[in-house]
């Protein structure tokens, strides 16, 4: 290798070619290699390797994206070039979406997503990590595709298959830390700093000496997925842990770089942040001084829905139950605020954090599609002690009610895999680390975390037990069972109705009104944008039938969980207990 200055070294590949005309053969273009740094053994893999066929501790293998075969030359982006905002997002994990847990197997299930009405597939992290199975958030080869899933070529085929079916692809990427096993990045330079700390240890170095190279490493990684693998959007994990005191935040630089690439490619590219800051600066354009994210996950929507449906009020759910010194009398009042304001914590006190939290959303001018709403996510299911889904906690009618609220809201909806049919399989935390000391530490950490919430640790599953991952694999045979099929039909109908009443343009929370009755356990939301069809989602969360007053008279019932028990009068809907209906005007 040749030093080219500033700590960089260069190698241009084989010095001789195998063909008589000087053209390298295929064997010349695929080479295994590793680095010996300052004489230290053993050699370590390339931090920018695209391919780790023998695992994250083994040599890297060269991979040329120009060798990929694509059939998506006519692809204009999700929703015929509209992008992710406002579309139906579907979060899935390659390793548990199917029993085989590969990209090839996932392709076989894509038609189900098309039939459901999905627009964008949100793929959980695929960066190379230690072991066969895992959630993916312990990635260490950030440029490499996890080989047990199929490797880089298989991922390209998956993206191509999605595009062939009209599905966009959003890839979950983790830039706020690296996993503990196979993390050799610090040997290559000052990629981490003790000037800041994170839950995983020293922070990624974004603002100390030599940070420009680290920032470039992250931005190049993002652009590579979008450019070389034709990905349409990136979900950025826990961006609040990107500790950056620079004059300009990394996310703003990343946003501008992605915008420039989108212009070059001629198709929309979106960045979706996972952020618990409740800070609208995250979704404010960089030209206005913001960080330029297209959208952000909105956990407040999840928390409000979950507490409303389940009655749980421990931990970070406490404030979402209302009462006890809050302005909101109960969980339904909290739900009303979140559905009309975007956040519960918009500068108000957070008892979980012990201080005021968040900023208000300008409901007149901020595009509501920039907030993602959901009833379940991998985190909100998998970080429960038994990984139990909402379908294991509440009856189908209540899940249907919650689904109607977020699927027909002006925010961007996201479904977690299997949610649409009320999957009976849990989603549990699983690992397959080869380092037994690390595995023991993970086990102890999970037990301590659940004990801190007051739960008995006797029921905590072993993340390293292969049965834990196997239990989390979707049981696709359930789709055709009557009870599951009913819920699936409901989700499909809500999505189809959304296309009629929400449309494809910008939306406003200011167009939403909500009326609740805490005692009667009823909710009515009215979305009435000027010049468009008005829609109301009407819920009876109580056990007994109830007459639920509407916020305007007339209309017609377009959808009901229990059609035979649902009747519309001039200004009310009579609903059976634990059910929902949608009224249009």
Named regions from a protein language model:
Residues 569-585:
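C-terminal beta-strand-rich structural cap/linker in extracellular carbohydrate-active enzymes
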Residues 538-542:
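Asparagine-centered strand-capping/turn motif at beta-strand->loop junctions
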Residues 341-358, 415-430, 452, 456-535:
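Glycan-recognition and catalytic regions of carbohydrate-active enzymes
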Residues 37-77, 165, 183-199, 316-319, ...:
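Core domains of carbohydrate- and sulfate-ester-processing enzymes
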Residues 1, 544-563:
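Beta-strand-rich binding/interaction modules
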């Amino acid at each position: 290798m040749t030093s080219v200055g500033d700590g960089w070294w260069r190698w241009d590949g084989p010095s001789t070619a195998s063909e008589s005309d000087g053209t390298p053969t295929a064997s010349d273009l695929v080479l295994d290699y590793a680095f010996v740094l300052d004489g230290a053994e053993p050699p370590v893999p390339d931090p920018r390797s695209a391919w780790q066929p023998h695992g994250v501790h083994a040599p890297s293998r060269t991979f040329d994206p120009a060798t990929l075969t694509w059939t998506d030359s006519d692809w204009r982006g999700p929703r015929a070039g509209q992008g992710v905002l406002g579309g139906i997002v579907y979060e899935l994990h390659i390793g548990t979406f199917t029993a085989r847990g590969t990209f090839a197997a996932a392709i076989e299930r894509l038609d189900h997503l098309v039939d459901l009405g999905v627009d964008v597939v949100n793929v959980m992290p695929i960066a190379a990590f230690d072991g066969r199975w895992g959630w993916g958030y312990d990635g260490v080869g950030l440029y490499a595709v996890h080989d047990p899933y199929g490797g880089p070529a298989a991922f390209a085929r998956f993206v191509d298959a999605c595009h062939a079916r009209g599905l966009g692809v959003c890839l979950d990427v983790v830039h706020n830390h690296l996993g503990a096993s196979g993390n050799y990045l610090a040997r290559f330079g000052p990629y981490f700093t003790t000037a800041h700390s994170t839950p995983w240890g020293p922070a990624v170095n974004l603002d100390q000496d030599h940070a420009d190279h680290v920032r470039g490493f992250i931005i190049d990684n993002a652009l590579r997925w979008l450019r070389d693998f034709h990905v349409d959007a990136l979900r950025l994990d826990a961006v609040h842990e990107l500790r950056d005191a620079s004059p300009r935040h990394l996310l703003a630089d990343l946003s501008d770089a992605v915008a420039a690439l989108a212009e070059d490619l001629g198709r929309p590219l979106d960045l979706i942040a996972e952020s618990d800051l409740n800070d609208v600066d995250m979704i404010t354009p960089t030209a206005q001084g913001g960080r330029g994210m297209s959208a952000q996950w909105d956990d407040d929507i999840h928390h409000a829905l979950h507490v409303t449906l389940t009655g749980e009020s421990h931990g970070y759910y406490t404030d979402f139950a209302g009462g006890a010194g809050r302005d909101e009398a109960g969980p339904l009042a909290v739900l009303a605020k979140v559905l009309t304001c975007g956040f519960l914590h918009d500068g108000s006190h957070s008892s979980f954090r012990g201080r005021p939290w968040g900023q208000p959303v300008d409901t007149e001018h901020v595009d509501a599609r920039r907030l993602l709403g959901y009833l379940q996510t991998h985190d909100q299911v998998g970080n429960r002690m038994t990984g139990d889904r909402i379908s294991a906690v509440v009856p189908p009618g209540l899940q249907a009610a919650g689904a109607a609220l977020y699927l027909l809201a002006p925010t961007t909806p996201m479904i977690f895999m299997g949610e649409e049919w009320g999957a009976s399989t849990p989603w549990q935390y699983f690992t397959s680390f080869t380092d037994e000391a690390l595995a023991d530490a993970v086990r102890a950490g999970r037990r301590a975390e659940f004990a801190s919430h007051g739960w008995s640790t006797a029921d905590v599953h072993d993340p390293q037990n292969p049965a834990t991952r196997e239990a989390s694999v979707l049981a696709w045979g359930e789709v055709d069972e009557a009870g599951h099929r009913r819920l699936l039909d409901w989700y499909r109908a809500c999505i189809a109705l959304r296309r009629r009443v929400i449309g494809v343009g910008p939306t406003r929370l200011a167009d939403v009104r909500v009326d609740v009755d805490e005692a009667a356990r009823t909710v009515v939301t009215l979305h009435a944008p000027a010049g468009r069809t008005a829609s109301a989602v009407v819920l009876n969360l109580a056990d007994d039938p109830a007459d639920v007053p509407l916020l305007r008279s007339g209309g017609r019932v377009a959808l009901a969980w229990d059609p035979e028990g649902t009747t519309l009068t001039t200004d009310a809907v009579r609903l059976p207990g634990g059910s929902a209906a949608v009224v249009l005007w």
